[in-house]
């Protein structure tokens, strides 16, 4: 469960290390985002020679949450932390590699590029 001001790890090689959620997209009253939701983020920590700089604002898709995601069969998948993948204006990933596992729910939300780049899909 991601809300405004939540700090997330970045699960790609775009150059950002930490991002902060500044808006949950999808309606004016929407408070929380889960796996597969698109959020607006600001880069808080970045690598020296990355594609993004500290202070830049991007869209990002949430790929892992500590809250977890409930499956229709009743199982629940939780992660140790919250992570996102930074997207460009066309909602395509900026990075060329994805680090760590991602959930199968991303496949339903038209993020097949992220699913195909990920080392493990749970």
Swiss-Prot record:
Alphabetical list of InterPro entries matching this protein: Ribosomal_uL14, Ribosomal_uL14_bac-type, Ribosomal_uL14_CS, Ribosomal_uL14_sf
Alphabetized SUPFAM superfamilies for the sequence: Ribosomal protein L14
Residue stretches spanning the membrane: none
Superkingdom: Bacteria
Keyword RNA-binding found: yes
Gene Ontology cellular component terms for the protein in this record: cytosolic large ribosomal subunit
UniProt GO MF annotations: large ribosomal subunit rRNA binding; structural constituent of ribosome
Keywords (A to Z) from UniProt: Ribonucleoprotein, Ribosomal protein, RNA-binding, rRNA-binding
Coiled coil (UniProt feature): none
GO biological process, one term: translation
The keyword Ribonucleoprotein appears for this protein: yes
Pfam family, one: Ribosomal_L14
Subunit and partners: Part of the 50S ribosomal subunit. Forms a cluster with proteins L3 and L19. In the 70S ribosome, L14 and L19 interact and together make contacts with the 16S rRNA in bridges B5 and B8.
PANTHER family associated with the record: 50S/60S RIBOSOMAL PROTEIN L14/L23 (PTHR11761), LARGE RIBOSOMAL SUBUNIT PROTEIN UL14M (PTHR11761:SF3)
Family: Belongs to the universal ribosomal protein uL14 family.
Main function: Binds to 23S rRNA. Forms part of two intersubunit bridges in the 70S ribosome.
Protein name: Large ribosomal subunit protein uL14
């Amino acid at each position: 469960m991601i809300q405004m001001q939540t700090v997330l790890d970045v699960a790609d090689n775009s150059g950002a290390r930490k991002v902060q959620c500044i808006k949950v997209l999808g309606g004016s009253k929407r408070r929380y985002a889960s796996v597969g939701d698109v959020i607006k983020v600001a880069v808080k920590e970045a690598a020296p020679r990355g594609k993004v700089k500290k202070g830049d604002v991007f869209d990002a898709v949430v790929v892992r949450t500590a809250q977890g995601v409930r499956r229709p069969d009743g199982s629940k998948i939780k992660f140790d932390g919250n992570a996102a993948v930074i997207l460009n204006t066309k909602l395509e990933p900026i990075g060329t590699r994805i680090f760590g596992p991602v959930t199968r729910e991303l496949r339903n939300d038209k993020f097949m590029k992220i699913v195909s780049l990920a080392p493990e899909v749970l």
